[in-house]
């Protein structure tokens, strides 16, 4: 044994990152969607706004917007694999929009170290006056905040319930819990 590492574990492959990555498809529970929309309404008059949902998935947020009185023509939603009639197929990160006055409300795909969520935020910042994201608590760190468009500032940060998400392939809830916050940026 050398350096506290046995012979069998010295191979490069044994230290490889074995975390699986995929399409980051974790969908938001409808009760959590309602909490997010209510929180957004405390800071933003959504009654006449155009809403951008760039990670539409199963349409949980789209359904929430409709429940909260937002007319369907004012909702724009994308996903690479849409599972709702009002969610258009498309990669938001490759999308160019005409308006700069959207309100973005979403549960973005996080990615490793929030890499995808940061990309979603920075792309949305080109088109939105407000960005409202359901994200891991790590977004409270300066290292995350400093990687976001500096023209935006945090106006609200709310702790969310422990079990915010479900996956379409799992019939039982996941045992590991992700601590999340709902942040509103302007």
Regions of interest found by a model, annotated:
Residues 1-186:
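Class I S-adenosyl-L-methionine-dependent methyltransferase catalytic core
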């Amino acid at each position: 044994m050398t350096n506290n590492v046995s012979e069998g574990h010295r191979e490069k492959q044994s230290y490889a990152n074995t975390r699986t990555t995929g399409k980051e498809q974790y969908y938001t529970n409808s009760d959590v969607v309602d909490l997010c929309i209510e929180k957004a309404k405390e800071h933003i008059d959504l009654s006449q706004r155009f809403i951008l949902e760039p990670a539409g998935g199963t349409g949980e947020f789209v359904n929430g917007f409709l429940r909260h009185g937002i007319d369907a023509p004012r909702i724009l939603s994308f996903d690479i694999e849409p599972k709702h009639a009002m969610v258009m197929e498309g990669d938001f990160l490759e999308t160019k929009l005409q308006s700069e006055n959207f309100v973005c409300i979403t549960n973005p795909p996080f990615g490793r170290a929030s890499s995808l969520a940061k990309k979603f935020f920075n792309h949305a910042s080109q088109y939105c006056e407000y960005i409202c994201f359901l994200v891991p608590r790590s977004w409270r760190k300066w290292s995350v905040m400093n990687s976001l468009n500096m023209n935006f500032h945090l106006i609200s940060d709310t702790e969310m319930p422990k079990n915010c998400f479900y996956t379409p392939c799992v019939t039982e809830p996941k045992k590991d819990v992700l601590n999340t916050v709902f942040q509103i940026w302007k």
